[in-house]
Amino acid sequence: MTAVSPDYLVVLFTTTAGANGSKLGSDEKEVIQLLWKVINLANKKVGELHEVTVRPDHLELTEECKEITQIETDDLYVAPQLEQALQQFNQSVGNELNIGVGTSFCICTDGQLHVRQVLHPEASKKNILLPECFYSFFDLRKEFMKCCPGSSDINELDVHAMASFLGFEKKNTHYRYGASEVDDMGDIIVTLISEPYNYKFSDPERVNYKFESGTCSKLEMIDDNTIIRARGLPWQSSDQDIARFFKGLNIAKGGAALCLNAQGRRNGEALVRFVSEEHRDLALQRHKHHMGNRYIEVYKATGEDFLKIAGGTSNEVAQFLSKENQVIVRMRGLPFTATAEEVLAFFGQQCPVTGGKEGILFVTYPDNRPTGDAFVLFACEEYAQNALKKHKELLGKRYIELFRSTAAEVQQVLNRYSSAPLIPLPTPPIIPVLPQPFIPPVNVRDCIRLRGLPYAATIEDILEFLGEFSADIRTHGVHMVLNHQGRPSGDSFIQMKSADRAYLAAQKCHKKTMKDRYVEVFQCSAEEMNFVLMGGTLNRNGLSPPPCKLPCLSPPSYTFPAQAAVIPTEAAALYQPSLLLNPRSLQPSAAAYYPAGAQLFMNYTAYYPSPPGSPSSLGFFPASAGVSTMPPHNTGAMVRMQGLAYNSGVKDILNFFQGYQYSPEDGLLPVNDQARALLTHPKEWVCI
């Protein structure tokens, strides 16, 4: 309907029930007024002013709106709703222009907000189909800047600034808000198309009809000023839902990337790439706008963030996503033996898969073992909706979960599974841990357990909480327990100098308050503490053993010599070197080694790295009776190096530490991964 050079311009102005002016549309308030005027560009004539009052769904006007517009709530009760008001607008413009074959018109607004931030978002929420004329428009501010480059900055430009630049006198003809702006815009347009400017309105702004999916290469250069992060999305939302939330703004092709958590499930965040910085800035104004009943937070992000989620290099994925305008559905929970024929039979004739077998992409681990996930292409929305109705139907003996997916999610899932499994396979331990000769009796209840601590509690808070009993804590005797996410669990264990002092501390400190929370204090033994720190649970019904103590359904596939108590390097990096070199086992000194599979649970609970005055031993690492001894380096420290070049040698590492004090007897321990190394350093603890 819109030609490159239209015959008519329709000046359009909107008013909302909330903020107006530069903040128009930022508060999600509904439209309450439409004003427009038709301008004949060929004859340079301005038509009559038209005005329609619109009844919003929520008849509430802000005080600012009432003051500026002089509109009262009573004026809106008999007004038409937005859909009827837009029909009146379309019919009025058509009648006035007497549109025939070859006649064209285009909307013209003061800035981007009226169309992009008001009409399109509200119409999308109310499922109103906007006329085609609202998908292209002229931004009078931009056109004015092209015609008059010496005018004010576009961010400071408005109707009054443009009128002042052209020397118009201020009019007082209209008292209704918006009417004077429409009059001034008409005069400005007529002036621009007349002598001496003779400006032609061409190449209008475009609003995308729909979001286009696509792929993104990791090698692509992306402008940081075009990326936002949306947070708080419903877990079932798709890229189309994101595009609908940002309706009116142009998202780049394939520019909506849903983020996944460590388990491969959506975490409620998405990274969105827009076509320009201007559209990104408008998107930021939708911070805390609503998607259904949830408000969405919108923040700036970087191109690097986007590439981590949406970027990919797999030719298989690129070929799978090469078919455009396809709806992607993700299947989860497939039998590991499922074939493409079984997937096609699962969907049946009601929802045919695009391209048959070529429209199915199975997700596999690096060794080609199936993960139970697959992505399927459908040619249209109808087929996809029919497919989603099969959610939790059976394929074989397993029920299948179905979700709408995106091209970016395909890339992300394939990248995640092809690079490494979600749960790393256990690796052989490599760091010897020397046991301390002293082993405390397990039946002595010389420990106390604090339960219900504030999550922000520190060791200093605990010492203050215990008061006089803090003097009875063993050296390095405070154990802060972390959960499997590495965050404080609200529990702590304290080793006291005697069972009597532990008993008195439990009696006098039980249910005392710490930062407005009462804390429970129980007397316990070293054995009970050891069980909890290994991942077991301690409750009033007794001890629940940690995962690594549960009966094995099948023996481990491999074992390692039990020459020394050992921990994996991933766990070792969490602790101070003194903890690794001077351990104290709370287990009997019988030779013991947990199978490699048990190491998966070692981080279920962990020590908080304590300063001097807290524990110096790792009680849940079992010790062997016949361990070969080595002089402890009490003043040394362990350094872990990550990210080394694969061709790095010992000389390169020693040169790197030039200037630090290390002695020839310091140990250099290679790790299985060639890009890692450990160096014992006598003075400092450095993590690289």
From Swiss-Prot:
SMART domains: RRM (SM00360). It is found in: Nucleus. This is Epithelial splicing regulatory protein 1. Its main location: nucleus. It comes from the Eukaryota. Belongs to the ESRP family. Keywords: mRNA processing, mRNA splicing, Nucleus, Repeat, RNA-binding. mRNA splicing factor that regulates the formation of epithelial cell-specific isoforms. Specifically regulates the expression of FGFR2-IIIb, an epithelial cell-specific isoform of fgfr2. Acts by directly binding specific sequences in mRNAs. Binds the GU-rich sequence motifs in the ISE/ISS-3, a cis-element regulatory region present in the mRNA of fgfr2. One of its GO terms (biological process) is RNA splicing. One of its GO terms (cellular component) is nucleus. Signal peptide: none annotated. Residues 226-303, 327-407, 446-526 form the RRM domain. The gene is esrp1. InterPro entries: ESRP (IPR050666), ESRP1_RRM1 (IPR034427), Nucleotide-bd_a/b_plait_sf (IPR012677), RBD_domain_sf (IPR035979), RNaseH-like_sf (IPR012337), RNaseH_sf (IPR036397), RRM_dom (IPR000504). GO terms for molecular function: mRNA binding. The lineage of its organism: Eukaryota, Metazoa, Chordata, Craniata, Vertebrata. The keyword RNA-binding applies.
